[in-house]
Amino acid sequence: MPEGKIIKALSGFYYVLDESQESGKVVQCRARGIFRKNKITPLVGDYVVYQADNDKEGYLLEVKERTNELVRPPISNVDQAVLVFSAAEPTFSTSLLDRFLVLVEANHIEPIICITKMDLLKTDEERETIMAYADDYRQIGYEVHLTSTIEGDGIEKLTPHFHNKITVFAGQSGVGKSSLLNAMSPELALKTDDISSHLGRGKHTTRHVELIRTANGLIADTPGFSSLEFTGIEAEDLGLYFLDIRDRSGDCKFRGCLHVKEPGCAIKDAVEHDQIKEYRYQHYLEFLTEIKDRKPRY
């Protein structure tokens, strides 16, 4: 039986990109009743087995195991998230970036940090500040790209990361996500209004998610992580999603250390010696308080 990947779901139809051929054929499929009986809802991003009645229509037979699953937008098997933040207009926010990084790490998705609008930095001091932040995150182990769609800087180094992967874009509103996409793939120009209406405003104006074929990969046309709450993340697990904290937490004196007031805490020691940046630690404490103060849902 042929296999493929769902790239669009709309009105009970699932549009499957046939991956057994290089033709890029898309087959419109319905789901068998067995899916409803077993309470399985196929998602955009799912790898599926299907049966084709002809070249254009068929039925889904099987949904393969998912590596991850996002709720908003409903999409599965996301390989990476490009976290787009601007160097200026709006101001670069490490707090918001760290929040996105926690959410991405918790969903087992590879993050790529992309700082746009580098051309808007007017002074050497402004540029040095952004470069220092970029170095901080690189030292933690993150991929960081500095780009300017106006000057075309950095785009060519970013594009190869999309090859054969499902990618979502996320980040601040108004940071130029759609401009970045168009700089990478000029053929998307026709879709700019559509993409910017989703990505730019951070509001969902349509009821379906679609994966767009571009840069030899698939990119979601809807922003990832529209909810920025730490739902499902427990206080004792938060440190796992700060890589610089996770790598050192095994050196704490007490198992289960939350790195707040506990004696013999390797994290607080690392902060004092500038091995973990103070702002990262403060964000950890802020997020920890937010999680502890979270009202239980019944």
Curated annotation (Swiss-Prot):
Gene: rsgA
Domain of life according to the entry: Bacteria
Domain CP-type G: 67-228
Enzyme Commission numbers on file: 3.6.1.-
Example GO biological process: ribosomal small subunit biogenesis
Source organism of the structure: Bacillus pumilus (strain SAFR-032)
GO molecular function, one term: rRNA binding
EC top class named in words: hydrolase
Obligatory cofactor(s): Zn(2+)
UniProt keyword terms in alphabetical order: Cytoplasm, GTP-binding, Hydrolase, Metal-binding, Nucleotide-binding, Ribosome biogenesis, RNA-binding, rRNA-binding, Zinc
Similarity remark: Belongs to the TRAFAC class YlqF/YawG GTPase family. RsgA subfamily.
Family matches, as InterPro entries: G_CP_dom, NA-bd_OB-fold, P-loop_NTPase, Ribosome_biogen_GTPase_RsgA, RsgA_GTPase_dom, RsgA_N
Binding site for GTP: T116, K117, M118, D119, G171, Q172, S173, G174, V175, G176, K177, S178, S179
Name under which the protein is recorded: Small ribosomal subunit biogenesis GTPase RsgA
Pfam families reported in the protein's UniProt record: RsgA_GTPase (PF03193), RsgA_N (PF16745)
Co-factor: note: Binds 1 zinc ion per subunit.
UniProt: Zn(2+) binding residues: C252, C257, H259, C265
Subcellular location: Cytoplasm
Function: One of several proteins that assist in the late maturation steps of the functional core of the 30S ribosomal subunit. Helps release RbfA from mature subunits. May play a role in the assembly of ribosomal proteins into the subunit. Circularly permuted GTPase that catalyzes slow GTP hydrolysis, GTPase activity is stimulated by the 30S ribosomal subunit.
GO CC, alphabetical: cytoplasm
Subunit note: Monomer. Associates with 30S ribosomal subunit, binds 16S rRNA.
